[in-house]
Amino acid sequence: MLSKTIAAAVQGIDATMVTIETTLDWGNQVVIVGLPDTAVKESSERVRCAINEAGFQYPNKTVVVNMSPADIKKEGAAYDLPIAIGTLASDEVVKPDLLSRYMIMGELSLDGSVRSIKGALPMAILARELKLEGFILPKANASEAAIVNNLKVYGVDHISQVVKFLNGEVELEATVVDTRAEFAQAQGNFPYDFSEVKGQDNVKRAFEVACAGGHNIMLIGSPGSGKSMMAKRLPSILPPLSLSEALETTKIHSVAGSLKSGTTLLTTRPYRSPHHTISPVALVGGGTYPSPGEISLAHNGVLFLDELPEFNRTVLEVMRQPLEDRQITISRAKYTTNYPASFMLVASMNPCPCGYYGHPSKPCVCTAYQRQHYLSKISGPLLDRIDLQIEVQPVNFDELANRTPGESSEAIRRRVVQARAIQSLRFKDSPGIHSNAQMTTSMVHQYAEPDAEGLELLRNAIERMNMSARAYDRILKVARTIADLEGSISVRSQHIMEAIGYRTLDRSNYFG
């Protein structure tokens, strides 16, 4: 008897329908066709043991499994459960009546228990688009899949539950999540707040400007000056995630398998801080079977690269294009995968190898050449893509001893949200553009053209600092953001002056 089970394959952050056809023939082997990977081919032994351990009889015949369409690579052990159910249906142990109404996915242990899978959320979205009645999957993934409306999600722990449900012997309890209620309730829960930061008013201001316009920022300062501490507080002043952003962010983490069991919706912006020993594949994504890298896991959030010059030069260079395109394309021989990568880059570095150049009390032992060589580990094109470069000085004793709390993250966030609202209105007719940092060159000329005094100020700065054309655009974008924070319609000279002040590494005398 031929049975058909509905499953799914994840491509990028979306899912594609896979039909698993199972039939029995003479002999005693298992044949799986349809471009399966090694894990899928190995499922035959897991399925055999799981069926027998669950109290059913594995058919003493050749089991032929066809996974269509055949041109899509089937990866991972998530096909164990649908293959097992298809096998039992072909052997007339499971009634086939309900198989066309449910998507079934799950990895099987040898005892028949069902283990978690990757990509449950995009699969659930596909099941709804296919107008299926429900989605049967591991209980550990039920919460993330249940955020999809108009779809019944059934989390199971054991294959026997699925068999009894499909045979009409038991009713499974659907997992229900009130997505909007959970999204609203979880907003604004941050472990760190800028009110805890002593001093550093100029750095706080730079962070406010960066968040208001979605700009990348570099912090240059000695060890212990508070670079990492302040970077951790950055998500607390970014605008809240919209529901659509939260869904997209959760999809990426679902595909990567980084969601904790029981997680429904990611409601705060991601903050990723990879170690400087990270490989290019781990940073941008890829591998034999592509999966999202750190830049995609930071989508709609913050990617913090601490001690930037310590990263391998190759690692940093592969990040240049995603910074511009806000997505990463991974090409393989037979297919291409795209992952979103619209993140805010926050980088930090010491000013020199010893770390104390410019320190008010500790002498630097590096030569000017050593300082220049240290910076040269970061390419010019990458530095050009960082809009704000701010020097972080150590906090003095009086500021440390001051018990008066600083301005709260909530107060800063309100100004950031107001500036972003101005930008949303400005770019309402420009698809894919949401903030000043994303403006094209023509948009910069249209929306960020300074007044005559500001233009002359910018001309002098460009000529003296020998800046690139990209740096010119960056200054105007930052100046536009500063004007938005003030509620100013036009970009004036004081906005240009402040924006130029955030180009620390462009100063010719910075390294002595």
Question: Which residues does each predicted region cover?
Answer:
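P-loop NTPase nucleotide-binding/switch module
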Residues: 170-209, 213, 240-295
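Basic, amphipathic alpha-helical bundle interface domains used for macromolecular binding and assembly
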Residues: 33, 39-44, 59, 66-76, ...
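The Walker A (P-loop) glycine that initiates the GxxxxGKT/S ATP-binding motif of P-loop NTPases
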Residues: 221, 285, 307
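Residues immediately C-terminal
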Residues: 110, 303-304, 310-311
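Peripheral, non-AAA+ core regions of ATP-driven protein-machinery
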Residues: 1-218, 222-228, 331, 471-472, ...
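Walker B catalytic acidic pair
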Residues: 300, 306-307, 318
